[in-house]
Regions:
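Short S/T/G/P-rich N-terminal loop/turn motif that feeds into the first structured element of a domain
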Residues: 1-51, 56-70, 90-129
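Conserved short beta-strand edge segments in small beta-sheet-based binding/regulatory domains
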Residues: 36, 76-92
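Macromolecular interaction modules
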Residues: 72-74
Length: 129
C-alpha cells in the first residue's frame, strides 16, 4: 500500500538526520533499507513545515516496520492512505506484491513535486552543510 507521510524533524535532530542520509545509514538494518534514502531524496518541505513523501509499505499496520527508524529523527504527524485501497491490487488481493510494479508511486510523487521545496535542500540550508 502507498502512504502519504507528513512529518517534522525533531528539534535538534537535523544534523544527525543529514549525517545518516549522507552516510547512507538511514534505515540501516530495516528490510526496507534503501527506501529510506529514496524517500528523503523525493521528500518535499511544504508551507506548513512538514516534510512529505510517498511511502510503500506491505505491513498490516501502516509503517509497522519503518516507524521506529523514522521516529528516531521525525515526529510523524500524519500517515494516510495515498490512494483508494479498493483500487490497490495488493490490498484487494487480486495481485500480491503488486506495489512493486505499480506506477501509482511515480504518479503520486510527480504530483507531490509540485508542492513545496526539496526537503534535502532545505535540511542542508538549516544545518549549513
Amino acid at each position: 500500500m502507498r502512504y502519504l507521510v507528513r512529518a517534522r524533524v525533531k528539534s535538534g535532530r537535523e544534523k544527525d538526520l543529514l549525517k545518516a542520509i549522507d552516510r547512507e545509514t538511514l534505515g540501516q538494518g530495516s528490510v526496507a533499507e534503501g527506501e529510506y534514502l529514496r524517500n528523503m531524496n523525493d521528500a518535499r518541505l511544504c508551507p506548513d513545515q512538514t516534510a512529505r513523501w510517498v511511502e510503500v509499505c506491505y505491513c498490516p499496520t501502516p509503517l509497522q516496520e519503518e516507524r521506529p527508524y523514522w521516529e528516531e529523527y521525525f515526529e510523524l504527524t500524519r500517515v494516510q492512505d495515498a490512494h483508494d485501497r479498493r483500487k490497490c491490487r495488493d490490498e484487494n488481493g487480486t495481485e500480491p506484491w503488486a506495489c512493486g510494479e505499480c506506477d501509482c508511486t511515480a504518479r503520486l510523487e510527480n504530483k507531490l513535486k509540485k508542492t513545496g521545496i526539496p526537503f534535502l535542500e532545505s535540511l542542508r540550508s538549516v544545518t549549513n552543510d
